[in-house]
């Protein structure tokens, strides 16, 4: 049995994509490895791994494009801190090929400057589908849409980016 304390966190970036109406993009995960069936906790904002030596802002824009097809976005700001979460014990040693105990994430707020028709969940060749549906959600409902172990991260990101959402 792998002990979480023996494993590192996976370095990641996340994007809170905010539209003109002050709503936030969320995608419904195509695979639901972390959400028990029937819970509805299948939604999340775009996020993904930070490659070694990669600039975090560039990684955030890359992940946004890979997962949503969106290129019409501008960065508004980033969180003051990295946010970490631990996987539930039952997933440690299996998720991400057993290499990580969870993720530590730097988040970016971005303004969506395109049209909804730009959003394309079809993956590029060589990539796996991240989301099979999407919607614009109010920022206040985000914590209830994600798996419970990510909720504190989302609450922190919301606190830091609330002024971007309300300033739209």
Which residues does each PLM region occupy?
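N-terminal strand-loop-strand
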Residues: 2-45
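Charge-dense polyanion-binding interfaces
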Residues: 159-168
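Active-site-adjacent beta-strand/loop module that shapes the phosphate/pyrophosphate-binding cleft
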Residues: 81-120
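NUDIX/MutT-family hydrolases
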Residues: 107-111, 118-152
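The catalytic Nudix box helix
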Residues: 45-80, 138
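Residues that scaffold the ATP/ADP-binding catalytic core of kinase and kinase-like folds
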Residues: 27, 53, 145
